[in-house]
Amino acid sequence: MKKAIVCGAGGFIGSHLVKALKKEGFWVRGVDLKYPEFAPTAADDFVIADLRDPVNCRYVIDQPFDEVYQLAADMGGAGFVFTGENDADIMHNSALINLNMLEACHRRNLKRIFYSSSACMYPEHNQMDPDNPMTAEDSAYPANPDSEYGWEKLFSERLYLAFGRNHGMDVRVARYHNIFGPEGTWRDGREKAPAALCRKIAETPDGGEIEIWGDGTQTRSFLYVDECVAGSIRLMRSDWTGPVNIGSEEMVSINALAEMIMGIAGKRVNIRHVPGPLGVRGRNSDNRLIREKLGWEPSETLHDGLAKTYPWILQEVIEAGLAPPEAVPAARTGT
């Protein structure tokens, strides 16, 4: 039986990755500061450990693993990343985790390790036009990320690639673009735009009002979590290092995203634009390289992903006692 370890297995993407590896027949160890919030872990062994401590990293890397997935990081959506209040923690905590995990894997002579970077490492100056952002993998330099989160991701990419060159490690680097889906954070201040808008619309009665940061014309692409997991595993099993974008090319404005969710929810709410942290004006995955190197790209539409995500968040909102009264019968009947 093959063995894998998933660091960050208590998080959104990590918990889904554990499930996928288990379906393939792997024995899986999950590691995180916490268990998954919304469902029991599928891991065979789950270790609560702070990977900022090198002793803990050596403890969890206590045997040969066929695949190591390093997704653990201090991160969140725009409300966490772009306020400036969390910059020191973001850089310090995530950098320590990556330094420690690479050293632990190197000492154990584990060769194959996957690192989840982010599209936030792309230069801000290439993403000022909401209709024509540039995120080709070779556009990363000259470097100019729009946040300390992006700078840390860029540093850690180089760290993994350096360990690959100098220590013969078979590293894989993916740049994630706005992953969403069920069992993701939806209300703790770290949620990303799809979850935040699903929550706001679920909480608001028909004809009510929600807030959107900025003018809503800023653009993004969003990738459903199952496709993210599939792309990550495919990259891990390939003979190519990356870095490569794992994201959707279906770009949408935040206003249009809200409209799409309203359609799925079967309600109309008004939008009030307010000041708030925004990030770049436009971002979209460029999938030319992943098509060339892996012969694969995500195929699920944003609408289909949201159609699976909104009902899950609606149920969470109802169970938390935050939904308007008319939402409860709809959730019970599945409409």
Regions found by a protein language model. Give the residues of each.
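Active-site helix of classical SDR
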Residues: 148, 152
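NAD(P)H-binding glycine-rich loop region in Rossmannoid oxidoreductase-like domains
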Residues: 51-94, 107, 124
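NAD(P)-dependent short-chain dehydrogenase/reductase
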Residues: 125-134, 158-236, 249-251, 259-265
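N-terminal Rossmann NAD(P)H-binding glycine-rich loop of SDR-like oxidoreductase domains
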Residues: 4-24
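Conserved glycine-rich Rossmann-like NAD(P)H-binding loop of the short-chain dehydrogenase/reductase
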Residues: 26-35
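Conserved Rossmann-fold NAD(P)-dependent oxidoreductase catalytic core, especially the SDR/UDP-sugar
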Residues: 99-146
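Rossmann-fold cofactor-recognition segment
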Residues: 41-54
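C-terminal substrate-binding subdomain of Rossmann-fold SDR/epimerase-dehydratase oxidoreductases
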Residues: 20, 203-335
